[in-house]
Amino acid sequence: MPVGNGAVGKTTVTRVLDWVSRKKQIDKEVLSNIRKSNNLEFEFVTTQQIFGSTHFNVTLQFLIPPGQKEADGDSTGRSFERVMKIYQPSIHRLDVILFTYDLGKVETFHDLVYWVDGVGTLMNDATHFILLGTHLDQQFENEVSNDEIKGGLEYLRKEIMNIRPNWKGNCTNLEVSCITGENLTILLRYLAGSVIKSRQIMP
């Protein structure tokens, strides 16, 4: 599940990962037409990966909630909180959380404090998480430093430990570009490996 403010690339990342998994070219025209999520959206990506000497065929199901906060007001009534109240009973397991922010908008990074509180109850003790920065292709506009990213990762880890003292999942940070495709193959592999590892920790 990718979470974060609106317009940080949650839907875009999942759409492009599907193309990467099928070795298709990134379609910039399609990307330009992606609109914000107003409900819980679903994307599926299947990838084949080798870990050690074992071949895995992993299907990833992405649940993409809105990035609108209830406190900010939403005329459609489809804030993150409202959508989660509807769908939370049907969400049985989250193997990976993508805390997503825009490298060029530092406020989206700082707002991850809000999102970790929002998904804490959805996690289990084996849920992995990735601190995911988007818009890596716009490096000249980056507002989030490497030191801030490292500090943010540690902050999220501590917050999750406070929420779930028996948490055994792994965490990392990664920065990607949906325009150039940079690091998306790495992200796809990490997601697949995280699902496998999460299921090994807690079948």
Give the predicted meaning of each segment.
Residues M1-M202:
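TRAFAC-class small GTPase G-domain
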